[in-house]
């Protein structure tokens, strides 16, 4: 019987599938951070349980760690300091490997998992974070879980899960100039909506997806949850294997050859059926900018801010009216005329070396607009080190960007990097909800190249018409 990629991974991890009850899945890798783990560890302690598989549990600090070097030594925020200290104590007590603030391996959990080779094709991966779907770029079944589920996995290394439906989204053809992986996923969400994939696992396919680097594939899978999906997956191929080869936690020698042989079978069989399918011609995609308060409120850079009359229902009309009020925008305003105050390049969506190279290429030879505050936050220490070896930090600093230490930073208002009320930010992150980057902050989601261009011009700009200076620097 022909099977989809999802079905193969799901069935390989079934412990039990009783009738009329959730299935029980074995979990290969549990990623842990400081925010959603303290109560779970306390639950183990109170019930006298041990951590079932410390060898399949890895922790880091990322969500509320400061990104200014001096502030990382003594963390001023009381809640953040308590959470980080609790993670240190818990990892020491339960035997969990922790990549702490000063560790070379520290970084955003969804950046370090792949770069260390912890993430592998065919795995089941969970984390107490919505954007765990990032790891699906490797052909893993990866999804976020709540704190009670974190404790369940810690205690049993298994998790009850209802079987989701399958949804294949194929992007076919060559991507137009200036269109990136971020634009692919924003374009998808714009088409199907923020609930368009609720109850599904998405498999991304098609020639445009296959042409992406692993960094690009991670960006696409990262935002699957923003379309309502439980997870997003891409079949592993030679691009995947080349990325994983020789990484710290990847198999070596004969074990590598055996792993690649097994991973090569993780693809949807010809004739396998999906519950739903969508084909998008790549030529229809464009650089996008979100204008509202969810990722589905997105338009091409050349469009105008929509008005309530464009809504398909009364509920949607009210949503547009509320979003326009919160965002301080008027219908009919060209997106390219919307001025910004802050630029944030970072997050688990777009903080990898490829993202920083793309942004640096845009800003080379330019200066940040005098009215804009701009920062670049690498996703991990290793990304930061690589960028500094390539001189990207110098390019950003000379242009007027702040060059920060690794962490989740301005993606969410849980650390010192926040917007003030009314500030408007061009952000490479994944969510633009009300208050996401700080109370009253206004978030617009864009690609790294689009964010970099906005930092220079002071407003949203079409990257397709950008005049690049000094491309040879990054050749």
From Swiss-Prot:
Pathway: Amino-acid biosynthesis; L-leucine biosynthesis; L-leucine from 3-methyl-2-oxobutanoate: step 2/4. Signal peptide: none annotated. GO terms for molecular function: 3-isopropylmalate dehydratase activity; 4 iron, 4 sulfur cluster binding; metal ion binding. It is an enzyme of class 4 (lyase). [4Fe-4S] cluster binds at residues 348, 408, 411. Its EC number is 4.2.1.33. Binds 1 [4Fe-4S] cluster per subunit. Pfam families: Aconitase. It catalyses: (2R,3S)-3-isopropylmalate = (2S)-2-isopropylmalate. Keywords: 4Fe-4S, Amino-acid biosynthesis, Branched-chain amino acid biosynthesis, Iron, Iron-sulfur, Leucine biosynthesis, Lyase, Metal-binding. One of its GO terms (biological process) is L-leucine biosynthetic process. The keyword Zinc does not apply. Its cofactor is [4Fe-4S] cluster. Gene3D superfamilies: Aconitase, domain 3. Belongs to the aconitase/IPM isomerase family. LeuC type 1 subfamily. PANTHER family: 3-ISOPROPYLMALATE DEHYDRATASE (PTHR43822:SF9), HOMOACONITASE, MITOCHONDRIAL-RELATED (PTHR43822). HAMAP family: LeuC_type1. Heterodimer of LeuC and LeuD. Catalyzes the isomerization between 2-isopropylmalate and 3-isopropylmalate, via the formation of 2-isopropylmaleate. This is 3-isopropylmalate dehydratase large subunit.
